[in-house]
């Protein structure tokens, strides 16, 4: 986000507004504004004028759960403003509500004309990205209908139907055409001397297929009360560290964000669930890997996230090969999209299985959840899903045929299918990309942990000793192979990946820290790796870089080739603690907490890789999610790893 854009989030709904609360309807660029629900823009213009002019911003919108600003008519120092407009906005579930309070500053009656230009273009989020792609929409029709107390925008394309309804209290005096698809709602307010008048506008988005009976909140204050109640329940029982107030504040901020970043999902029996979304603005939907890691980080404090995430992912687990070759039996979904382009197959992400690591992470979380909570009932309920996930790992995943979990670039989808999924993220030190199949190091660590944890479930919950022994042997064999094939003795470090010919992809990357978290490396190798990650080419002062500097492939602003990811560092910190490297774990934890403190105690999705010694403030990465569930949960992982030290 730029300093002119502000994000409001509630579940699967978010809005991006400017300093004065307006929505401009921009397309392309880093952060289009609007009201978004289920991948579609349900408000594309929302622009206020007073007496025909755009008011001046006295106090701009500030980031928070509601957008508030103070506006006045433009004028000079010799003529104080005739009135002041107090504007407040908030988002609810599928809704947007605004309060406009106009106060006269004059001792005589005045008349003020307020106009609000509104439009809904129903653009899919994928159309708004700055990748210059275009999508045909043959037969698409947009409609506008004036209501007694507002108006309704509609959109249809084949069987696809969406609408946005705007109502106002009091009703507008007129609804005017603008010469475009937008409409202008107009009120003429008669204000008594120093009097006040208030307008309340409510927007209800009805995306395709949403049959829920939703109610628009009566006011932004009602949304605020609901959010406070939600956050209060989310905080209950969490013991924040008293000796480290900055970590306590980061944990509190993270829990607040996790509370707002939960989106609806459905379990195997049709039960309604709420699970962590990927992040806003671009990924406010179920992402398998992201939901699993956020739930893992929060597990000691908020196990209900895992209790919802696991059934939701079981319900979307692939049951057979479909038109997508990636939907193989037992595989856990990578991404679920609800938008128009996904519905018509114009993007592959409606239910997309392009992740090599979501499946083992599903098993890791299931084992960790049962071990932590003692809730064996969930393990019984999801037994067939867990066995199917193991089956995928051994069969389509490649453990039996290749010895490792393996993926291949998906034409039209993701070239890389581990957590570093941007093009070119898996590379050699010189920047060249591997050819053929890819066996990413971090995914092998997850597979090892998944095999061991599922063996424990088989023995202690399912009573299947034979299956447990089989999985334990598979884990031991994987560990032996990995240290033989991935370890680079000349660099005393594991390779980032193996290519299709089994050659080592030799970039020095942060993924090695995930092997510590999984426990895949022998203690001697693990200690070497852990200390290496704290050397200056890796450690920026704000965290461990995704790629060590000094390599030709390094770029401090690259998404995955030199940046610093909080969730990546949270896993590294947990791994350092696991291998007894407590000083190193505290160093990384303090760096991340300092980065959070510099940004209002909120960790972003990703930071630039610039060193703290050359730039004393953390630098944000362009196009990153402002709020992201893994980053929100990362302070909780730090608390687990190092306590309040």
Model-derived features with residue positions:
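Helix-terminus loop motifs that line ligand-binding clefts
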Residues: 269, 302-380, 387-401, 406-409, ...
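Extended ligand-binding clefts on enzyme/binding-domain cores
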Residues: 380, 387-444, 483-548
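An extended acidic
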Residues: 1-82, 94, 107, 121-122, ...
């Amino acid at each position: 986000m730029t300093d002119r854009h502000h994000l409001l989030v509630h579940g699967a709904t978010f809005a991006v507004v400017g300093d004065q609360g307006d929505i401009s309807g921009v397309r392309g660029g880093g952060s289009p504004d609007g009201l978004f629900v289920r991948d579609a823009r349900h408000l594309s213009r929302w622009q206020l004028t007073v007496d025909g002019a755009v008011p001046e911003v006295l106090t701009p919108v500030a980031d928070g759960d509601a957008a508030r600003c103070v506006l006045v008519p433009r004028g000079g120092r010799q003529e104080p403003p005739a009135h002041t407009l107090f504007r407040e906005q908030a988002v609810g579930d599928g809704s947007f509500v605004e309060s406009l309070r106009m106060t006269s500053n004059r001792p005589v009656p005045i008349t003020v004309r307020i106009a609000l230009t509104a439009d809904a273009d129903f653009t899919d989020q994928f159309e708004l990205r700055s990748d210059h792609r275009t999508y045909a929409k043959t037969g698409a029709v947009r409609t506008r209908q004036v209501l007694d107390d507002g108006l309704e925008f509609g959109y249809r394309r084949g069987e696809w139907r969406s609408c946005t309804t705007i109502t106002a209290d009091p009703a507008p005096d007129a609804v005017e055409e603008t010469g475009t698809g937008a409409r202008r709602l107009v009120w003429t307010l008669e204000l008594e001397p120093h009097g006040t008048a208030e307008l309340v506008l409510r927007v209800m988005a009805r995306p395709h297929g949403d049959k829920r009976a939703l109610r628009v909140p009566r006011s932004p204050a009602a949304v605020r009360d609901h959010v406070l109640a939600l956050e209060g329940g989310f905080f209950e029982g969490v013991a924040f560290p008293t000796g480290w107030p900055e970590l306590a504040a980061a944990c509190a901020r993270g829990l607040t964000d996790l509370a707002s970043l939960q989106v609806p999902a459905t379990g195997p029996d049709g039960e309604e669930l709420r699970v962590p979304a990927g992040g806003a603005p671009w990924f406010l939907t179920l992402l398998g890997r992201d939901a699993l890691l956020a739930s893992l980080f929060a597990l000691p404090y908020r196990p209900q996230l895992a209790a919802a995430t696991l059934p939701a992912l079981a319900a979307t687990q692939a049951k057979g090969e479909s038109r997508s070759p990636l939907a193989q039996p037992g595989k856990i979904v990578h991404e679920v999209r609800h938008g128009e382009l996904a519905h018509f197959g114009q993007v592959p992400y409606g239910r997309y299985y392009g992740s090599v690591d979501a499946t083992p992470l599903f098993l890791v979380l299931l084992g960790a959840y049962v071990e932590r909570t003692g809730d064996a009932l969930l393990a019984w309920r999801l037994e067939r899903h867990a066995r199917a996930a193991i089956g995928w790992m051994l069969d389509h995943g490649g453990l039996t045929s290749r010895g490792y979990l393996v993926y291949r670039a998906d034409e039209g989808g993701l070239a890389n299918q581990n957590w570093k999924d941007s093009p070119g993220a898996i590379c050699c030190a010189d920047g060249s990309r591997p050819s053929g199949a890819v066996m990413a190091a971090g995914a092998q660590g997850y597979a090892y942990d998944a095999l061991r944890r599922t063996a424990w479930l088989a023995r202690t919950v399912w009573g299947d000793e034979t299956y447990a022994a089989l999985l334990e042997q598979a884990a031991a064999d994987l560990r032996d192979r990995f240290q033989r094939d991935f370890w680079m003795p000349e660099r005393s470090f594991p390779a980032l990946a193996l290519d299709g010919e089994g050659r080592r992809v030799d970039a020095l990357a942060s993924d090695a820290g995930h092997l510590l978290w999984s426990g895949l490396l022998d203690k001697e190798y693990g200690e070497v790796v852990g200390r290496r990650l704290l050397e200056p080419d890796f450690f920026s002062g704000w965290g461990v870089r995704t790629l060590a500097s000094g390599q030709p492939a390094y770029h401090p602003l690259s998404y995955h080739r030199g940046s610093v990811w909080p969730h990546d560092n949270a896993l590294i910190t947990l791994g350092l603690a696991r291998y007894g490297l407590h000083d190193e774990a505290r160093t990384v934890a303090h760096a991340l907490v300092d980065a959070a403190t510099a940004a209002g105690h909120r960790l972003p999705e990703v930071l630039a890789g610039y060193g703290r010694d050359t730039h004393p403030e953390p630098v944000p990465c362009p196009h990153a999610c402002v709020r992201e569930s893994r980053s929100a949960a990362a302070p909780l992982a730090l608390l687990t790893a190092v306590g309040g030290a």
